[in-house]
Design a protein with these regions (language model features):
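Bacterial Sec-dependent N-terminal signal peptides
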Residues: 1-4
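N-terminal phosphate-binding or glycine-rich loops at protein starts, especially the Walker A/P-loop
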Residues: 7-54
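Glycine/threonine-rich flexible loop motifs
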Residues: 115-126
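Short internal beta-strands
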Residues: 55-63
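Glycine-rich oxoanion-binding loops at beta->alpha junctions
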Residues: 72-105, 118
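Redox-cofactor binding/interface segments in oxidoreductases and associated redox assembly factors
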Residues: 61, 111-112
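Conserved small/polar residues in nucleotide/adenosyl-binding loops
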Residues: 130-137
């Protein structure tokens, strides 16, 4: 097979192709940053928020925030997302661990962050901490 004919699909592309079936009827929390995009560079936040059969209820931002507007090393605060109006919980603020209050309205967590595999990046540890928190609260990831 020639490399030019190989098409890589990200998770959001697969979810779109499946019409988000696995998220239907669930309250969805999204852990993401600006790397969470589809093949047209549309934000996963906006895609899930606009999908009629997805109930996106909360966003979770790692270092740099969900929209990438926080400098490296700065603490990220809990805010409302200006575009969607959804609550944005910081994963890089006063606590690096999810509190029960952060997860109380969520049935399933979607993690959409690309990582380069560099040990100085905090995204992989964010994934580990939140999948652990999800398991503790019987949430699906």
């Amino acid at each position: 097979m020639q490399a030019q004919k190989i098409r890589i699909k990200t998770g959001i592309e697969v979810l779109k192709e499946q019409n988000f079936r696995c998220l239907e009827g669930k309250r969805v929390g999204l852990i993401t940053n600006p790397t969470g995009v589809d093949n047209r560079m549309r934000s996963t936040i906006d895609i899930l928020h606009e999908a009629p059969n997805v109930n996106l209820v909360a966003l979770y931002g790692p270092e740099h925030g969900v929209r990438g507007d926080v400098h490296a090393g700065d603490h990220v605060t809990d805010i409302k997302d200006a575009t969607t109006g959804l609550p944005v919980y910081s994963l890089y603020g006063k606590t690096r661990k999810a509190t029960p209050d952060m997860l109380k309205d969520v049935d399933v967590l979607v993690y959409d962050i690309q990582d380069i595999g560099c040990r100085s990046f905090t995204y992989i540890s964010t994934c580990l901490l939140y999948t652990s928190d999800a398991a503790d609260d019987s949430l699906r990831v």
